């Protein structure tokens, strides 16, 4: 990638105290506004990253830290209550205090540099501070926030919300969730036919908020030279490339969180293997606003040997996820930033601190690699871990984890390619080199499905023996759906078998979709019709049988809903995708 460097400013600030000397930090922004940050030490570059990111989006960083430290509702009232409760429910502060000694001194210096950068920015820009009690930000506050993010990434919050709502298993909303997804592709010289390896980093994150990407380039005299992206509040790059290698992530969905129903003897005593245990009562404190006044509210939860615990009308339930068992994920990412070879990179994966995420990798030595990574518990196979499991026996109380070597992975395949699109790790390269699902415990519950994107990716990657860089870019920017459609959660293909003459009141809409070339281009009328139709499916999804097949009659109902929506909002049944789906930033679209 070619950069045109335009020096907008050089940062020189002076502070009396602290580990970092700001005179050793230089921030140069290129023509896109991306900060290129130079420092003598990694702590220097972390300081510069914090300052640059704060210049661009200090509000989001603060809101993230407020939520992670359980005080967001002090600033925004009831909107922050949910995040504050979960942050206190998982007791991150206690976890960080207990495990802080497991961090290296080198990484603690990075954390100190980053938090010094935020504190210095706040000191020089007091009008931008949302809540003064958040400051000074410390390395521990940073880590406490990261614990919340990782718990959310393991979908632990869904179980908490379900239990509070007097359910146990969270509702799945695949129609809505399928609009989110990421893709990774890595090609070695076996596939490129040249002395080159290609890596596509195509993660899809929100444009705003605590999980929106922030691009940066970090350089230090301690061996760091990496460009990539990070989340607000993180002190290092989370996906990117250095001079030697690059990696990216997509979200994976093995079983990363469990719910246990406790056997209660009375309101405060539960029984495990015939032995009585006492629930430890805890209280989360949040705030709401009433006529401008900040009113404290509280919610009781408990601690059991299974983890943080809640009571609802159905019983007492504990939520347990590996993300809360260590605080080393950020240091693992930081070490990955500095890796110079596949063996070194893999050795950091063996820390087993990241609770999840697929990883796609390529390096200058022509090694490509894929792994469905995660801290996956070793569970008793006699239980169905997709459901609530009994919390009355230590047979279900897992405390050990599969090693990195025991996870589904592909290293340097003969096919010359690996890929993932939030689908099964058992379809990650050529068919004869895929991981064998029979070699992995069913209780790990790895995905076994393909989806539209993975189906299309495989078709494109396997259609030619070698792929040029132009081919690679064409695949990366491909907007086509496969034939037949391959949604992993529903079969909608009956729409292409419907005779428009049999449905005259929606014939125009049906023909637009049936004549569509499956390319989701902004100017496509077929794509526009299909997109509107797609968003009508959600309310009917839970009416489907186990096969999850939309029959013609139900599709007809959805088509009528789509037509009604189009006429109401667009005054026509024929619109382009770009009329319905737009990227809007301020006054630009």
Language model segments and positions:
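Short alpha-helical segments and helix-capping/turn motifs at coil-helix boundaries
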Residues: 104-105, 117, 121, 180-186, ...
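Hydrophobic alpha-helical segments
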Residues: 354-464, 537
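Glycine- and hydrophobic-rich flexible loops that cap the catalytic core of alpha/beta enzyme folds
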Residues: 220-221, 228-231, 240-244, 249-388
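Substrate-recognition/specificity elements adjacent to catalytic centers across diverse enzyme folds
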Residues: 20-223, 227-236, 322
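Bacterial Sec-dependent N-terminal signal peptides
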Residues: 1-20
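Acidic, low-complexity N-terminal propeptides/linkers enriched in Ser/Thr/Asp/Gly that mediate export
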Residues: 107-200, 205-207, 364-368, 376, ...
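Proteins synthesized as precursors that undergo proteolytic processing into mature forms
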Residues: 331-357, 364, 437-492
